């Protein structure tokens, strides 16, 4: 553990919420386990962290997945799609608001820094703004403030999960389901149990909390990975 690495924020938070952060050396050791490392080197294998904190695990996995996406890419455009595909496989739920804010910021920073640097190093090009815009939507959809055990978000509404299903190499189909529907076996495919999460609406003050009725699914039009930000609904 590094000398400046804090494992707790306060004794009260440990007492009230059991909050203890994982040191980086432990994160690295866990991700280096063969069964985990193999999934990290996959653009479609998904990870859910039900108590995500500030994103120690998710950020490290994202960093490694983006580098793997770069290895597979043969062009700047392909790298943009693969980078978004890698990002779409990572999901987090966190109870505490300040942690969720840091989680979202850390995921955004990790994606943007890696994408910008790899674009410059590999292709001598500037980042595509559409990739940034689409990454923001994915992170907003995949990082939820809520209670994973109760399956509710910060507003008491059902946690919503998005399945990002690749269509070939360049397109994606997004489908949203309540966590309850997934737990009950009503998911759209046999892979949704890998977990696909969503919307900490309070993190984006220009958006209003959404109240969910009886409908358990919402369908988005298939689109290019780089057009996810348009969020066109079927």
Predicted region positions:
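SAM-dependent methyltransferase catalytic region
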Residues: 2-234
């Amino acid at each position: 553990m590094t000398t400046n690495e804090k494992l707790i924020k306060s004794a009260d938070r440990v007492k009230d919420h059991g909050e203890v952060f994982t040191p980086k050396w432990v994160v690295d050791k866990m991700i280096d386990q063969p069964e985990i490392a193999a999934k990290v080197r996959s653009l479609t294998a998904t990870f859910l962290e039900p108590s995500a904190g500030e994103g120690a695990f998710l950020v490290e996995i994202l960093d490694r997945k983006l580098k793997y996406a770069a290895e597979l890419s043969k062009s700047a455009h392909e790298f943009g799609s693969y980078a978004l595909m890698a990002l779409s496989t990572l999901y987090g739920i966190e109870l505490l608001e300040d942690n969720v804010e840091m989680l979202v910021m850390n995921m955004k920073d990790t994606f943007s820094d890696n994408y910008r640097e790899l674009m410059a190093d590999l292709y001598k090009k500037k980042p595509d703004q559409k990739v940034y815009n689409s990454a923001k939507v994915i992170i907003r959809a995949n990082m939820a403030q809520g209670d994973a055990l109760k399956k509710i978000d910060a507003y008491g509404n059902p946690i919503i999960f998005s399945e990002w299903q690749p269509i070939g190499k360049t397109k994606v189909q997004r489908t949203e389901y309540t966590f309850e529907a997934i737990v009950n076996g009503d998911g759209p495919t046999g892979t949704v149990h890998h977990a696909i999460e969503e919307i900490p609406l309070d993190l984006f003050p220009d958006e209003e909390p959404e109240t969910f009725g009886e409908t358990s699914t919402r369908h988005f039009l298939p689109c290019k990975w780089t057009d996810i930000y348009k969020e066109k609904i079927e």
